[in-house]
A protein has these predicted regions:
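Class I (Rossmann-like) S-adenosyl-L-methionine-dependent methyltransferase catalytic domain
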Residues: 1-45, 49-105, 121-135, 141-202
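A short beta-strand submotif of the Rossmann-like class I SAM-dependent methyltransferase core
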Residues: 114-117
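A short acidic, Gly/Pro-enriched loop at the edge of an enzyme's catalytic core
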Residues: 104-112
Length: 202
């Protein structure tokens, strides 16, 4: 396996747009609303050790950092890493450049976030990432995936296919889903009990 699995030129061109924010994370209400909904579906108020795979310029990461005692933010693009480092000036946040699945850490996490990046992967690479998730989610952990549900050009997978594969291959309890008109948002947990049950309400 080589680093050709990452389309360097595509993302290098993309991050030249809008000062490194080609999706306008900071300008669009759509993006702000989606971040708020992603944070709202997290089943626990705090996490010991989180990872965001494909952190981009760190806009979502900054809000995840408020929920994590330690947060690892990973992206393959050097411009994204530079921008994320400028934004995430917290002692408990680490930003690293790396390619999925080659550079994934071999440690457990109780929060794994993949937002708007899995459809960039070839299916065999996605399956390797899922295998990693099945190995390194801690017993009290959760996985959150959020992806655009409309057409995507130039890649072999779309958001719907990604979430179907996740549902088929993840070994965890499918805790909740939110099917917005524009995106899929799904959560898996290690614990099969609902939050109400965990807090003694049931």
């Amino acid at each position: 396996m080589t680093k050709a699995i990452y389309n360097h030129d595509y993302f290098a061109e993309l991050y030249c747009i809008n000062n490194g924010d080609p999706w306008q994370y900071e300008q669009r209400w759509y993006e702000k609303r989606k971040r708020d909904m992603t944070l709202a579906v997290l089943p626990y108020p705090k996490f010991k050790n989180g990872i965001e795979i494909g952190c981009s310029n760190g806009v979502l990461s900054a809000e995840l950092a408020e929920r994590c005692e330690a947060l690892l933010c990973m992206d393959a693009n050097s411009t994204a890493i530079q921008l994320a480092n400028q934004r995430l000036i917290h002692n408990h946040v680490k930003v690293v450049q790396g390619i999925v699945p080659l550079d994934l850490p071999t440690q457990q996490f109780d929060l794994i976030v993949a937002s708007e990046m899995l459809y960039y992967l070839e299916e065999n690479i996605l399956l390797q990432l899922i295998e990693w998730m099945n190995t390194y989610l801690s017993p009290q952990g959760c996985i959150v995936a959020c992806h655009w549900r409309h057409a995507i050009e130039g890649f072999s997978l779309n958001g719907e296919q990604v979430h179907q594969i996740l549902k088929q291959r993840l070994h965890y309890y499918y805790y909740t889903q939110l099917q917005d008109a524009d995106f899929f948002l799904d959560v898996w947990t290690h614990d099969i009990n609902s939050i109400a049950a965990q807090e003694g309400l049931l």
